[in-house]
Amino acid sequence: MMSLLPNPDPITVPLVLKLCSFPPPRRLFSLRLRRFTRKSSSLLPLVAVSSLSATAAKPTRWREKPELAESDSISLLNERIRRDLGKRETARPAMDSEEAEKYIHMVKEQQERGLQKLKGIRQGTKAAGDGAFSYKVDPYSLLSGDYVVHKKVGIGRFVGIKFDVPKDSSEPLEYVFIEYADGMAKLPLKQASRLLYRYNLPNETKRPRTLSRLSDTSVWERRKTKGKVAIQKMVVDLMELYLHRLRQKRYPYPKNPIMADFAAQFPYNATPDQKQAFLDVEKDLTERETPMDRLICGDVGFGKTEVALRAIFCVVSTGKQAMVLAPTIVLAKQHYDVISERFSLYPHIKVGLLSRFQTKAEKEEYLEMIKTGHLNIIVGTHSLLGSRVVYSNLGLLVVDEEQRFGVKQKEKIASFKTSVDVLTLSATPIPRTLYLALTGFRDASLISTPPPERIPIKTHLSSFRKEKVIEAIKNELDRGGQVFYVLPRIKGLEEVMDFLEEAFPDIDIAMAHGKQYSKQLEETMERFAQGKIKILICTNIVESGLDIQNANTIIIQDVQQFGLAQLYQLRGRVGRADKEAHAYLFYPDKSLLSDQALERLSALEECRELGQGFQLAEKDMGIRGFGTIFGEQQTGDVGNVGIDLFFEMLFESLSKVEELRIFSVPYDLVKIDININPRLPSEYVNYLENPMEIIHEAEKAAEKDMWSLMQFTENLRRQYGKEPYSMEIILKKLYVRRMAADLGVNRIYASGKMVVMKTNMSKKVFKLITDSMTCDVYRSSLIYEGDQIMAELLLELPREQLLNWMFQCLSELHASLPALIKY
């Protein structure tokens, strides 16, 4: 261990002697050195670097000489770490191997339940069997022109199935003919059944970027590897999040008798699905020690809000706070009104709405009440996730319509999931949410039973004509109702306003969109809710939440510009009363629509029955592409390998997640056998004043973790400027040792042209890591043998160059760690 404590590393001793030979004030330096040595193993804070102050005058900032400058590989590594990890490492406390083993086993059990359920759904059975979960395609189900994926060759176009006589037989056999970029291939039918996958979902016609080549499968192998690595990173990140979630403990909430009184206020008879959802959430809160993460998937108006209200009451009645997060201020205001009314019998429970409608003084007052715990239920939009909102004792997060939040908001929501109970409400869950629910990583309750009085919405899909629009609006107004008229962009609202004012001169018409002044928007929505405005021309700001019983016709223009989930939510704005509701979906001209847009619209027409939001989301998963499962890409890595092979690789990775685990070794057990003793320039020693203490701080940071070492280096450079080359060598050795520890390497040494790394990693993990490497130079030079990773260099390198090689090579290996579980 590189330290000035007893039993110092032999590499450090010459360095100490060399440092002592430089000319800082001798008495001050020796006093500092003695004081530092007495500190034994106490860990000094990183800020000590920036708090050191010299008693003598010194330059305001150290500047290295130009000849010492070198391309800064440490900064490049730090940038990559910050990009890959963000603040995740600091947000998740360390977990030892034994503890990780227990939680991985728990997650595996959950996975098996989820995968069995998925398998049953895919096979159209109620219970899952024990057979293999396969996504391979039946060649007879293919149509000429369909894109297919051969696992070993790549992407081709299916031509057909024909009989042909093989060379060594007189009996004709059935062959599958597939067209590739450089020729035609024929496969025996039995072989094709084992190796062929669909590139697209049925009825989908997305074109791949290129067809594969029969004469060169290396490009296909690279694409497959890229897809596999991307999947590994998805699975590992998911696994780590849930490992840490399982690790969190909280006392179960008490089963308070007043819960029954609160539930009795519900004015309707609960449906069987609702009753089950109530029970599921109650068990999560009162019988489990692990924080809840449950998805309530229910169609519009099926009673999801009541489930949330009961969860909120359970939590806040114990003195904790609840946050209700909505994607728009309109929906947030509606939640606030519903919650305020429901909790009016409990004056000690304070409800607040934080929104842009408030004055600065009102916001400041609310922020203070949240911080001190005087506000029990906080309702609002993404502003609730801001750094200025500090919660006193947050116990529950309710998220409504998660699919409408942006990337950063979703990441913030995810960060809450490791510490508080989370309840997500959605009529059309985003694919990622649905996927987690189906695979057992997340619990889900499905409310698919409509209230007895609900009538299905009648959906009309046709090309746009003004006469049809006028007729639809007139029919609704004649029965005393109101109309939503929705457009995808603000730009077209004025034109529609002019058209409707001309067609209905005596009717009150208004516009609503997100760019309006807050009070103007609020006033418009309030007047529409009161029935004073008969036609509301708007953008999809009304997509979620508006509960207006008298509005039973919605007209959506340019439907091709909306997502399927958006259309389903917009359609759900009507049909909440006992009248038959109508949704008119208008497109400009079918010839202008993409195949995907047409598929989206036909899916919506198919799901006319009530309670089909869950099935619709499954269709949406296929139409939008599975890149959205784990992130925000619309196509994701599915395009590399096709939908079915991507699925198979995903589930294979999920089912073998324990093989993605790497066992790190303690930092102080790592040996770097390289005799290198850099001499620090006297000016730098003078400037640092106490270099020994700073080196000790660097060692302690490296011993803790990579994130701490990175922060130390950045703090050092922020305070003193870029270090000289000799100090960079010292830092690089610390980085090499830290990266080796993370990778499970306990010793690195060189013998002639051969560099050897002794490791505890398995051959499978080594292959996963090298597959992830982007630099061919290092990847091709590494081989795995026994318990060693070896690299043969072209020539024997001088010591400093050898250290640089180790640094670069380990940096490449370390970059693969996000694709591995590090416990």
Curated annotation (Swiss-Prot):
Keyword Nucleotide-binding belongs to the record: yes
Domain Helicase ATP-binding, first and last residues per copy: 285-447
Domain Helicase C-terminal: 465-622
Reaction equation(s) it catalyzes: ATP + H2O = ADP + phosphate + H(+)
Keywords: ATP-binding, Chloroplast, DNA-binding, Helicase, Hydrolase, Nucleotide-binding, Plastid, Transit peptide
Top-level lineage group: Eukaryota
InterPro entries: CarD-like/TRCF_RID, CarD-like/TRCF_RID_sf, DEAD/DEAH_box_helicase_dom, Helicase_ATP-bd, Helicase_C-like, P-loop_NTPase, TRCF-like_C_D7
PROSITE patterns attached to this UniProt entry: HELICASE_ATP_BIND_1, HELICASE_CTER
GO cellular component: chloroplast
Chief subcellular location: plastid
Location of the transit peptide in the chain: 1-53
Pfam families the UniProt entry points to: CarD_TRCF_RID, DEAD, Helicase_C
SUPFAM superfamilies the UniProt entry points to: CarD-like, P-loop containing nucleoside triphosphate hydrolases, TRCF domain-like
CDD domains (UniProt xref): DEXHc_TRCF
Family: Belongs to the helicase family.
Designated name of the protein: ATP-dependent DNA helicase At3g02060, chloroplastic
